[in-house]
Each structure stands twice: as structure tokens, then as C-alpha cells.
């Protein structure tokens, strides 16, 4: 497996693969990899000849400098895991290479229809940072396919819209959320949980699934459902952050024409902000 840190070497390798007619898959990450990331790599391997994994802690995605400073950097361990799963290249650039003009003078890519609603409303600039770095990586690596986890539902929707609007010829693949045996969605931030908090954490998904079941049975009092879920989270020990029920396709409020809903949940447990989502078929 190749490990490349500079743009010239990356471009040279991508050019070589293109000349050889190789189909390229991309898995963008911020490192601190877990089994959920490995599932993305495994999926990518089924869809391309070579798999590029990027490891870059993107400063544009962090609102708080302390959060950026404390984000785990585990490049050596990450590369060992990726070698075992058959990745072909790890691109791990420095921020100065990705943003040579500095963050203040950086040219941004924004998807305003999705970047400022829901989670974006409380995290200004976050999704603009996501779309900017993903666009840069698409331009640098020129993948045929790119794999993203469905756990970050709004992020995946934003990337799909960016690809459609910007005319990228890239197949975006959403990969189902990987969970621990007790139902907790795998996340790099789970490492912030204490032992006691880790025992509580699966309640987030259980409360979400109970809400989804009520909706599947025909309950449509959205405000009441969300208030009940928030109360359950508080009783379990969480601090609710974001609770939404939206049209799964548009991320707008449900209408009589909505065929599928998505429940979007985010809650703090200690120092960890946990997120999850669940689709609900409304056609019954």
C-alpha cells in the first residue's frame, strides 16, 4: 500500500493509474478509523480496481479550535488497518498543502440548499467545509466512485446534490451504518465516552427505533413525537442537540406527498456528540 503526503506524488500516481485504465474508488476520512470505515473500504474494493483512502482532519469542519486540536490523530494505526483491508493508496496531506492560501482566503464550495438547515443551522460553516474538501479531493483524485457512510445522512445528501449540481461524473455510494452488537452506531467520537457512558449510549438508537415504529404504525403528530423522544433522551442521561423528522429526499418538513421520512438525531453524552438516523416508509 502506498502512503503519499504531497500533491505532486498523488497526481503522478493517479495519472499512472488512469493511463493503465484503472477504475478508481475514493473513501474520504478524517482518520481515527474503525470498523465502519473498513466497511467503506470493503465496499469500494467491490466497485473499482484501486481504492484511495484520504486521511485529513479538515479544519474547515470544526467550529471550535479545541475540538480540532483534540481530534485523535492515529495515522500509523489507520494505515495498518487499511493495509489489512487491501487499500491501495493512503493520501495524508498537511493542511498547508490543501489550503495553501490559508483558511481565511480559501475559495469555498457551498450547497446552500442543504448546508444551512437542520444540523447546518447550529453548526455554521461546517457543511461548507465538508463540500469544499470533498470537491477538492474529487478534483485531485478524479474517482469513478466514492463511498460515504449513511450515518452522516445530511452530509451524504449534500454531497449527492453537489455532485449533481457541479456535473461531477462520479458514482456516490451510500454504505449502511455499522453498529456495535448493542446497536450503537460506530463513530470515532465513541472513544470520548467513559465506561458508564458507553453503557448508556445505545439508548439513543433504541429511542430512535421506537419513534420509527410509531411512525410506521401511522403516528404523524411530529411535534409530540419529537418532544417525547427528547424527554426519553433526557431521562436516559443525554443532552438532546438535534431532533428532526423530515422528508428523506428533500430534508424539508413532511408533506402529504412524502413517501419516506428520515429521523435525524444528535445528542451529547459527556464529551461525545452522538448522531444517528433512521428511514421510515410512509406509504403504508
UniProtKB/Swiss-Prot annotation:
Using the UniProt record, name the top-level EC class of this enzyme in a single word.
Answer: ligase
InterPro entries in alphabetical order:
Pantoate_ligase (IPR003721), Pantoate_ligase_C (IPR042176), Rossmann-like_a/b/a_fold (IPR014729)
Q: Which SUPFAM superfamilies match?
A: Nucleotidylyl transferase
Positions with a binding annotation for (R)-pantoate: 61, 155
Q: Which domain of life is it from?
A: Bacteria
Protein keywords: ATP-binding, Cytoplasm, Ligase, Nucleotide-binding, Pantothenate biosynthesis
Q: Which CDD domains match?
A: PanC
Molecular-function GO term, any one: pantoate-beta-alanine ligase activity
Pathway entry: Cofactor biosynthesis; (R)-pantothenate biosynthesis; (R)-pantothenate from (R)-pantoate and beta-alanine: step 1/1
**Predominant place of localization:** cytoplasm
Where does the record say this protein resides?
Answer: Cytoplasm
EC number(s) in its UniProt entry?
6.3.2.1
Residues that bind ATP: 30-37, 149-152, 178, 186-189
GO BP: pantothenate biosynthetic process
Q: Which residues form the active site?
A: 37 (proton donor)
Gene Ontology cellular-component terms listed: cytosol
Any single Pfam family the record assigns to this protein: Pantoate_ligase
Q: Known catalysed reaction(s)?
A: (R)-pantoate + beta-alanine + ATP = (R)-pantothenate + AMP + diphosphate + H(+)
Q: Give the function comment from the record.
A: Catalyzes the condensation of pantoate with beta-alanine in an ATP-dependent reaction via a pantoyl-adenylate intermediate.
What do we know about how this protein assembles, alone or with others? Homodimer.
The family note in this entry says: Belongs to the pantothenate synthetase family.
Recorded hits in HAMAP family, A to Z, give: PanC
**Name used for this protein in its record:** Pantothenate synthetase
Provide the species name. Yersinia pseudotuberculosis serotype O:1b (strain IP 31758)
> What does the organism's lineage look like at the top?
Bacteria, Pseudomonadati, Pseudomonadota, Gammaproteobacteria, Enterobacterales
Amino acid at each position: 500500500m502506498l502512503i503519499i503526503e504531497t500533491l505532486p506524488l498523488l497526481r503522478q500516481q493517479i495519472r499512472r493509474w488512469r493511463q493503465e485504465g484503472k477504475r478508481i474508488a475514493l473513501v474520504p476520512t478524517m482518520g481515527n478509523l474503525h470498523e465502519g470505515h473498513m466497511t467503506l473500504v470493503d465496499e469500494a474494493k467491490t466497485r473499482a480496481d484501486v481504492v484511495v483512502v484520504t486521511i485529513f482532519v479538515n479544519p474547515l469542519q470544526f467550529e471550535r479550535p479545541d475540538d480540532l486540536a483534540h481530534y485523535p490523530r492515529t495515522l500509523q494505526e489507520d494505515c495498518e488497518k487499511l493495509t489489512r483491508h487491501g487499500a491501495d493508496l493512503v493520501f495524508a496531506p498537511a493542511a498547508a498543502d490543501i489550503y495553501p492560501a490559508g483558511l481565511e482566503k480559501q475559495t469555498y464550495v457551498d450547497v446552500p440548499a442543504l448546508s444551512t438547515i437542520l444540523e447546518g443551522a447550529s453548526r455554521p460553516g461546517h457543511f461548507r467545509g465538508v463540500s469544499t474538501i470533498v470537491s477538492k479531493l474529487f478534483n485531485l483524485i478524479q474517482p469513478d466512485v466514492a463511498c460515504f457512510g449513511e450515518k452522516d445522512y445530511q452530509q451524504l445528501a449534500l454531497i449527492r446534490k453537489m455532485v449533481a449540481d457541479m456535473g461531477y461524473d462520479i458514482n456516490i455510494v451510500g454504505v449502511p451504518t455499522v453498529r456495535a452488537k448493542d446497536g450503537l452506531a460506530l463513530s470515532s467520537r465513541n472513544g470520548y465516552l467513559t465506561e458508564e457512558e458507553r453503557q448508556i449510549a445505545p439508548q439513543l438508537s433504541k429511542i430512535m427505533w421506537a419513534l420509527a415504529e410509531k411512525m410506521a404504525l401511522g403516528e404523524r403528530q411530529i411535534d409530540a413525537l419529537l418532544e417525547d423522544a427528547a424527554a426519553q433522551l433526557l431521562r436516559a442521561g443525554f443532552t438532546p442537540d438535534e431532533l428532526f423528522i423530515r422528508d428523506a429526499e428533500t430534508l424539508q418538513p413532511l408533506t402529504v406527498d412524502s413517501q419516506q421520512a428520515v429521523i435525524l438525531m444528535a445528542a451529547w453524552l459527556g464529551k461525545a456528540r452522538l448522531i444517528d438516523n433512521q428511514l421510515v416508509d410512509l406509504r403504508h
